[in-house]
Amino acid sequence: LQSILPNESEEHNKNYILQFLRDAFYAQNLVNTAGSIDGAIYQTKDGSSPIEVILEAKSPNNQSEFPSLQNLNCKAMQELVLYFMRERFRNKNITLKHLIMTNGYEWFIIDATEFEKHFADDKKFVKLYNDWDNNKTLFTSTKDFYTEIAKPKIDQVKQNIVFAYIDIRLLKKDTDKLKFYRLLQPAHLLKQIQYADSNKLNTAFYNELLHIIGLEERK
């Protein structure tokens, strides 16, 4: 993540974000783009399983398309709504776990159940999405979906959407950084069962994380 450059393109920085996820946590999973989705994490290495995590990346300088703590309704969120609805209703994917918006520094992590509750469970919204997806509305472009369908709906529910937020630039202590990495572990993002004490990090995993982020254990 030290390779993130604010003045570089979204594509440039996205590659570093996906590489970080592969190297740090997901060597046993496929982490790649998927169609128009910036980043997708699959349960399997060969991608034979459905997508379980969807990631939307923006450049740090692209503030207009990235959320803030005061307002989730931006293009990145509108894109996540579209990708979620496609996975749920076009691809019949019922195994989604989390959706993420990040610029490399800031991370908004949202449980897929929040999207299920606020979007997929709304029959009127689902019908509007399906009509648009089947070219039965006056507008058919993805831009129109963002502005005419997703944006008004997000405005209705944004105050009720629960999310985790971290700005890694504010993480000064090694212990705080390790809490961030724990959020990105498969145990959390893929909701995998943990049999060990959740308050303890596996020693090998802990040491590997320190190596990846260029730290040494301080006692």
What residues fall within each predicted segment?
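Short, glycine-/polar-rich solvent-exposed loops and beta-turns at beta-strand/coil boundaries
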Residues: 32-35
